[in-house]
Each structure stands twice: as structure tokens, then as C-alpha cells.
A protein has these predicted regions:
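Conserved catalytic-core motifs of GNAT/GCN5-like acyltransferases
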Residues: 122-127, 139, 144-159
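Conserved GNAT acetyl-CoA-binding A-motif
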Residues: 107, 114-126
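A short beta-loop-alpha structural element at the N-terminal edge
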Residues: 7-21
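Terminal substrate-recognition subdomain of acyl/acetyltransferases
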Residues: 2, 158-172
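Acetyl-CoA-dependent GNAT
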Residues: 13, 32-96, 107-108, 113, ...
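Conserved active-site alpha-helix within GNAT-family acetyltransferase domains
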Residues: 100, 104, 116, 129-147
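Catalytic cores of nucleotide-enabled group-transfer and carboxylate-activating enzymes in metabolic
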Residues: 26-29, 115
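Hydrophobic alpha-helical core bundles mediating ligand binding, dimerization, or RNAP-core interactions
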Residues: 19-27, 45, 49
Length: 172
């Protein structure tokens, strides 16, 4: 079910506490994020927004609908000269807003930015093997699986999830 298209804007430093709280809520579900809720810090999110948007190391966006932030995502430039053509993508659709077009809207805007940035040639992401909806979204946008790390996340006694590595070439 799709809601009216969310509006997409640049993340601001004052968004950090809200974005960190949303990530903690997502992380409370085993396997959704690699981080545990107590490992997600408001100051780290604030620093990421500063590094990406204010210092030009990438692009950090939020999606809003009816005045509420419903998702966030970013592209982060890799730091080594040999990988400077690659950006890492992270996306989080906030609790209760899945299957409403939020993820696709954020992805479309990030990919538009990546394609218009001459220094970006490749977009990489990782996703849990259990997140079939996200994998389907990424494939529909042209991402291909490049590899898999088996049993990378331990979510319970003798219970593991694979990480799937996907990428999209946007360069020449």
C-alpha cells in the first residue's frame, strides 16, 4: 500500500536524535540491523550527518510524510584512493512505514545524486538474506548480488543470518 509520495530533504544535525531513536527501534528486532540498540549513539549519527552533508563526503537524506520523519538513508564515500569511486548505501524505513514507497523514494533520490556526481561510479550495499522485500527493491533498481557472507550475524543461540552484498554500477 503506497502513501502519498514522501518528501525527501537533506538530513540536519538536529535530526540526529530522532534518526538514532528510529535505528534503535529497528535494531531491537533481531537481524534487522547488525547493531544492537545500545550500540546506536545520537552523537555518532550527528557526526555522520556533519561528515556527509556539511563536509561533502556523501549525501544523508530523510523522508517525511505528514510532518513526520518516516525514513532515512545515506551514501558515504569510501576513504581510500583506490575505492574513492565507490559509495556505501545505508537505508532505514522507520517502523510502521514499510511497504508505502518510502524506501523507493529514498533510493531514487540517492541514485539520482550518485548518477549526477562525476566521482561516483559504483553504489554498494549490504542486506540481510531474510529481507526479501528489500532485496526485491534493490534488484528492481538494477542492483546485482556480488557476494554473500554466510552466518555473518548471530541473532540467537545457533541462529544466524547471511549478509548479501549488492552493487549498482552508475559510472561510465
Amino acid at each position: 500500500m503506497s502513501l502519498d509520495a514522501p518528501s525527501i530533504r537533506k538530513a540536519r544535525r538536529e535530526d540526529a536524535s530522532l534518526l538514532a531513536a528510529a535505528e534503535r527501534a529497528i535494531a531491537s528486532v533481531p537481524g534487522e540491523l547488525a547493531s544492537r540498540p545500545n550500540e546506536i549513539d545520537d552523537d555518532a549519527v550527528r557526526k555522520m550527518i556533519l561528515d556527509l552533508n556539511d563536509r561533502g563526503r556523501g549525501n544523508y537524506l530523510v523522508a517525511e510524510h505528514a510532518g513526520a520523519v518516516v525514513g532515512h538513508a545515506f551514501l558515504e564515500s569510501l576513504s581510500l584512493a583506490a575505492t574513492s569511486h565507490v559509495v556505501r548505501l545505508m537505508i532505514a524505513v522507520h517502523e510502521g512505514n514499510q511497504r508505502r514507497g518510502v524506501g523507493r523514494a529514498l533510493m531514487n533520490e540517492l541514485l539520482r545524486w550518485a548518477r549526477s556526481n562525476p566521482s561516483v561510479e559504483k553504489v554498494e550495499l549490504q542486506v540481510r538474506s531474510s529481507n526479501e522485500r528489500a532485496i526485491a527493491l534493490y534488484r528492481s533498481l538494477g542492483f546485482v548480488e556480488e557476494g554473500r557472507k554466510t552466518r555473518r550475524l548471530k541473532i540467537g543461540p545457533n541462529e544466524y543470518l547471511d549478509d548479501v552484498y549488492m552493487a549498482l554500477w552508475v559510472g561510465p
